A protein has these predicted regions:
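Ferredoxin-type iron-sulfur electron-transfer modules in oxidoreductases and energy-metabolism complexes
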Residues: 1, 80-83, 87, 123, ...
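Short, structured patches in soluble enzyme cores that scaffold and shape functional sites
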Residues: 30, 104, 126-128, 153
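Short, well-ordered coil/turn elements that cap or connect secondary structure elements
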Residues: 53, 119-121, 146, 175
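Short, acidic/turn-prone active-site loops that include or flank metal/cofactor-
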Residues: 126-132, 185
């Protein structure tokens, strides 16, 4: 569990928030983990810096951001999923939000592929895709200094949505030539991290957990 709320992570940052009257071209959808889990918060804060550096006009929902409902749907809680979906789509419509970027593969998949069934007419991009575009446009010029790095293909980004090249382009942009070392199981054959499909909440013995095998 966590005692954090959805706005605590950006209290010291100068960012637009839609419910404060701010307007922006793009919504940065942070997600539950991105706003309340320490390790993921670091990713969210880094993403804000990247967006600012590239001059992207973006805003946050803050306290008005509700879970996409992905975990609930995966474990059979369809009613909870639909309640979350309805509330989020109403929020998108209220602020005229049409473009969304997110760092979470699960949120990405749900917003992009499942929300349209409920009227969620959105352009949804993963942050790696957005950053790849910014690199090609010359709006980001990172310094490559990582001498050894690997990349894990998340199930919902890779197998479900076939986003393979953008993350690698981004990783290579901050690495020395040849620094990216592929895992034995990669791309469509990537080994699940053991957190999706509600599995993160299953009470398996450690030796039987997917992430331990991985």
């Amino acid at each position: 569990g966590t005692s954090k709320d959805r706005e605590e992570w950006f209290e010291d940052l100068d960012v637009k928030v839609f419910n404060r009257g701010d307007k922006a071209d793009t919504l940065f959808w942070v997600g539950c983990a991105g706003s309340m889990v320490d390790r993921n918060i670091e990713v969210s804060r880094a993403m804000v810096k990247v967006l600012d550096a590239a001059g992207v006009d973006f805003g946050l929902l803050g306290a008005e951001e509700v879970c996409t409902g992905d975990p609930a749907r995966r474990v059979g809680g369809e009613l909870t999923y639909q309640v979350c979906t309805k509330e989020n789509i109403e929020t998108f419509e209220r602020y005229g939000i049409k473009k969304v970027v997110t760092t979470c593969p699960h949120c990405f998949n749900t917003l992009k592929n499942e929300y349209p069934d409920y009227g969620g007419d959105l352009e949804v991009v993963h942050h790696s895709e957005l950053i790849e575009g910014l690199l090609h446009e010359g709006r980001l010029k990172p310094k490559g200094n990582l001498d050894s790095v690997t990349y894990h293909d998340p199930c919902y980004l890779g197998r479900h949505n076939e986003v393979y090249e953008a993350p690698r382009t981004v990783v290579e942009s901050v690495s020395e030539p040849g620094a990216l070392v592929e895992m034995e199981k990669n791309r469509s054959q990537s080994h699940c991290c053991g957190s999706g499909g509600g599995y993160a909440w299953m009470d398996d013995k450690p030796e039987k957990r997917i992430n331990q095998d991985r």
